[in-house]
């Protein structure tokens, strides 16, 4: 659950420093500050203890009570799990639905397709949305090394920002690529109106092996938000200012 609350607040933020998911959350340390917006991400936990999966012999990860599985099959061959209960899998409803459909097809319909948990797109539905697919810049650096990456980025001004002359630095996009040609796209990130709609379309392209060479050769639809990805040329490595210099970014 996510909520943004306007106003000025003094919030005593209390966080558990214990890895035990069943410990009391309000303990150990208190941080206090004043905020103009409070973002509450309540989250959820796996109910494997309440459902007593251990009685069937199913093993769980002690730190989070989740089940470690490659193809939704637990350590007990005839017990399967899908959704948020799986360890290190995206906690998203569409992921659970897709995995469940494919599992049912394999069990009862002679299907062979496994769930692909890589490059799953998602969006945070805040007033200016944030959408992404693929790797973050930090994760890409961890896997590939900073010297082997090229990070394209830009601020942009949506059409609806022109009349009120809103600050273009509220909207931002980033493309994480391999440095070597043809620069395979490893991640795409977008902050702005309708980010979910924009990223949903590019998610299919990323799963198909999108490269930056293909992206920059694509003609955008003007004026749209999604076209900003086809216009980005500035890299972080260059040190150039990514702020738009004209009405068309």
Predicted feature descriptions by range:
Residues 1, 5-7, 135-139:
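N-terminal glycine-rich dinucleotide-binding loop that anchors FAD/FMN and/or NAD(P) in oxidoreductases
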Residues 3, 7-32, 38:
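Conserved beta-strand-loop-beta-strand element in the redox core of flavoprotein oxidoreductases
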Residues 9, 59, 147-150:
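Conserved beta-strand segments of alpha/beta enzyme cores
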Residues 18-19, 76, 167-170:
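A short, glycine/Asx- and small/polar-enriched loop/turn
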Residues 33-109, 201:
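FAD-site-proximal beta/loop scaffold in flavoenzymes
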Residues 94-117, 146-148, 206-212:
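Internal hydrophobic alpha-helix adjacent to the cofactor/substrate pocket in enzyme cavities
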Residues 113-129:
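Flexible, acidic loop-helix segments that line cofactor/substrate-binding pockets
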Residues 125-136, 141-249:
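Flexible, glycine-rich terminal cap/loop adjacent to redox cofactors
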